[in-house]
Amino acid sequence: MNQTRVFLIFAWLMVAALLWMEWGKDKAPANAPTPIASQAVPAARDPDAAAPAANVPSAQAIPQAGSPAAVPATSTTTATPATTGAAPAITLTSDVLRLKLDGRSVLDAELLQFPQTKDGTEPVKLLTEDAAHPYNATSGWASERSPVPGVGGFRAEQPGTTFELAKGQNTLVVPFVWNGPNGVSIRRIFTLQRGSYAISIKDEVINKSDAAWNGYVFRKLSRVPTILSRGMTNPDSFSFNGATWYSPQEGYERRAFKDYMDDGGLNRQITGGWVALLQHHFFTAWIPQKDQASLYVLAQDGPRDVAELRGPAFTVAPGQSASTEARLWVGPKLVSLLAKEDVKGLDRVVDYSRFSIMAIIGQGLFWVLSHLHSFLHNWGWAIIGLVVLLRLALYPLSAAQYKSGAKMRRFQPRLAQLKERYGDDRQKYQQATMELFKKEKINPMGGCLPLLIQMPIFFALYWVLVESVELRQAPWLGWIQDLTARDPYFILPVLNIAIMWATQKLTPTPGMDPMQAKMMQFMPLVFGVMMAFMPAGLVLYWVVNGGLGLLIQWWMIRQHGEKPSKIIQANAK
């Protein structure tokens, strides 16, 4: 049987299987997890200091910070009783973010540049107080024996509840303070930058009491995962949903919400890393100081999945101060903005694959795609341009693949004679076949290797188109006004069916089993149905790729002295 045909069947079936596996992955509804009892967790004054987790180490495992600094003599911080009662919610607004916070937790976060729907005005709400699926980011302090701020403990230093980045300003700075008993205070500064989704949160502990103060900072992301609808009509279910983290030693790792505690609570001390919660196109992340170690913990708190950093811990002597700073990212997976953060491994949140080699291929493809967009100013034309460049680059492999298949077809009559000569003696038939291949210098796998080299590239391109938030709600032309939504009139899927059908007719199939031939007739229809509900950008890729493949097939047939009309007639028999 024609080797090109065999591996074309294999490729199509493999694509279908992988697509179905990826659709089924990470989107099954997760049952509400059973709360896990705390084990050896520091008895903090703050009731929410640390989420319960299995096998959590004792307070001694929290990384210790460096030596604190002396409090400047000019400091005018005075000791006041600990604040009681809930602090009023504060709203911070930049050109890209609107945050609702209480000084300790970011309760709501709206992404002002990203509407929920193509024609809508409501922005995407990434963090939310929604009762069914709450999702927030918290930075607090915990201690076994020293006073720490609890919920509502931080108060804005400036009057008012609304702070907005003014025109002409690039930075919005809003300070908060907690005044504890006996002269201990913690000053917290929120800083928002124009055009940035990274929020700087800096804490300074000032001890003007007569005793040493001990405590550690914790930063956590907590959410009740949204149950994603099953099926091809929901692009959000294509993507990875869960926690990811990075360490210089182990690199990028991830844990899906549906398998959140299957491998335990992590409990790993890391310096120079970060932790994040991912969903389709958007994510939140805590990025601590590169030189300060934290204990990374995954936990479940009732129905909530928690990703948390604990530490560093501080011992602040009387008259001393200590500080720590972290960035909270609340926003899209925009490659250009992630690069500006200069955080190692953060580009992996654009989750092209959990495998490094596939992620590298995906990053390279997006680099080309983004440069094409900067020239063409349209993501649809950029996709077409990328496919054309890929086809040109892979043309030598396609030529080698077809050449190998053409050579095999020329020897089909001799193979048929060998089969007739040796009848049911498969061993002698195979031995004679291999001798023929050796004599005529035929590589039976010659059509396979080029295909195997191309497949990782096309798989990576598939995930580039799924994952890239840059394509979200981007138009192409005419009826395609959103490349991440399905084709409203199914024009591209129908074109895809026609191209696949024509490709089948132009693919020589000498000696193909009648049952296999009948199965192959249904492949265009099967793929057409699958593509009908996929994002239009993906279907556009398949249509252009298939159309160019059809032209190359026609050209190769003529180059090797074969006639397309004869192949079509042979396949029709």
Curated annotation (Swiss-Prot):
Look up and give the organism this protein is from.
Answer: Xanthomonas campestris pv. campestris (strain 8004)
Q: Does the keyword Chaperone apply?
A: yes
Which residue ranges does the record annotate as region Disordered?
Answer: 63-82
Q: Where in the cell is it found?
A: Cell inner membrane
Q: Which CDD domains match?
A: 5TM_YidC_Alb3 (cd20070), EcYidC-like_peri (cd19961)
Q: Which Pfam families match?
A: 60KD_IMP, YidC_periplas
Cross-referenced HAMAP family? YidC_type1
What is stated as this protein's family in its record?
Answer: Belongs to the OXA1/ALB3/YidC family. Type 1 subfamily.
How this chain assembles, per its entry, is: Interacts with the Sec translocase complex via SecD. Specifically interacts with transmembrane segments of nascent integral membrane proteins during membrane integration.
Describe its membrane topology: Multi-pass membrane protein
Q: What is the stated purpose of this protein? A: Required for the insertion and/or proper folding and/or complex formation of integral membrane proteins into the membrane. Involved in integration of membrane proteins that insert both dependently and independently of the Sec translocase complex, as well as at least some lipoproteins. Aids folding of multispanning membrane proteins.
**From which domain of life does this come?**
Bacteria
Give the matching PANTHER family.
CYTOCHROME C OXIDASE ASSEMBLY PROTEIN COX18, MITOCHONDRIAL (PTHR12428:SF65), OXA1 (PTHR12428)
Give TM regions: 6-26, 355-375, 379-399, 446-466, 488-508, 524-544
What is the protein's given name?
A: Membrane protein insertase YidC
Which keywords annotate this record? Cell inner membrane, Cell membrane, Chaperone, Membrane, Protein transport, Transmembrane, Transmembrane helix, Transport
Q: Which cellular components does GO assign to this protein?
A: plasma membrane
Q: Which GO terms describe its biological process?
A: protein insertion into membrane; protein transport
Show the InterPro entries listed in the entry.
Answer: Membr_insert_YidC, Membr_insert_YidC_N, YidC/ALB3/OXA1/COX18, YidC/Oxa/ALB_C, YidC_ALB_C, YidC_periplasmic_sf
| GO MF annotations, alphabetized | membrane insertase activity
Instruction: Keyword check for Cell membrane, yes or no.
Output: yes
